[in-house]
Amino acid sequence: VIARWTRLPWWAQVLLIFAAARGVTTLIMMGFARGQLMNAWTGASPDYGAFATMWDSRWYNIVAFSDYPSVLPISAEGHVQQNAWAFMPVYPFTVRGLMTVTGLEWNAASLVVAIAFGFGAALLFYKLMRRVQGHGSSLFAVVLFSVAPASPVLQVGYAESMQLFFIALALYLTLERRYVALIPVVIVMSFVRPTGLAFALFLGLHVVYRWFTRRRDPFPPRQIAAAVGATAASLVAGFAWPAIAGIVTGDIHSYTQTELSWRADYIGYQELLPFTPWIQGFHWWFGPVYGTIFLVALVVAFALILFTPLVKRLGVDLRLWLASYALYLLAVFFPQSSTFRLLAPMFPLLGALAIPKNKVYRVALVVLSVAGQWVWLEWCWRVNGADWTPP
């Protein structure tokens, strides 16, 4: 068996790993589906298709068939309420296109798109890891990617697998220094999920780093122009969706006010001030004293992790991406149960975890990851009464 496995091409190994992981996750999710009570999205004990298209999948369905509102829903108190502008168009319209071509229903089509892009993301992740480490570690990084605690999101009606596909492709093109090819990728990526601003920061840091190291690593004018162009494209695309929402609704703040409506249940309606959401969140969860201590400790710990020997072996560029995305989350995101899902774009960190070759260590990581899936599904996906822990 081992001999046959080693003779397989890398892409076949990656696809088999990801398929096996999805099979395990499907069994776990079916167990949860059997025990699922009637809720806002499904009846009791729904089939897999219904169970996997709860929560935000319904919003994507609304986008696909009802489009975006030109008039924002306003509460009696005058606040913007939750609406479709929080969900970007590439994933739902891709699903609708597949439905038109194949005749599939929404549940099936949304899962086909999500799972297909999950397979693609796994293939690109392997290629990305091969830029910085050997075949064995790269393949085990794919294993960790495939069985990660929040990996069930790769086989539900969400846009995350599509987002990770484009992030992996964009990072790979950056490491390959194919900046012109990168431009359309970052533009499309910015309309899958809000990623453009974080990637623009990463590309800006990448350009600065290449400029200061140009003596040992030449940075010719054509590459400079292309890299700066890709950075600008990502920056403009990152602001484009809020601008479009503002133009359609006539309210330039419509997108940010829509996003803020999701955290209002925790802290009420407040203005978005960069880098305050995590302070507000940690104070809400832990109180002002312990919240401040825990937040400072978390930021310091993450900064130190970026300089550990294993993470440094990922190379400067991937660490710049990790830092950029973390800074973006710190600036705009309110920490709650969706945090685990929103950490998914930091998947290059799995490459560092995959470097040690100790068999006990690797088996333990896989077992803990699969157990983590059960925890994530129990805490975040399964609907339990008046559920306040969305995935």
Locate the predicted segments by residue.
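Transmembrane-helix motifs of polytopic, lipid-linked glycan transferases
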Residues: 97, 109-132, 303-307
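Membrane-interface transmembrane helices that cradle and orient dolichyl/undecaprenyl
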Residues: 170-181, 357
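Membrane-lumen/periplasm interface segments of specific transmembrane helices
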Residues: 21-38, 200-213, 221-305, 318-322
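Transmembrane and membrane-interface helices of multi-pass
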Residues: 131-133, 139-157, 171-172, 191
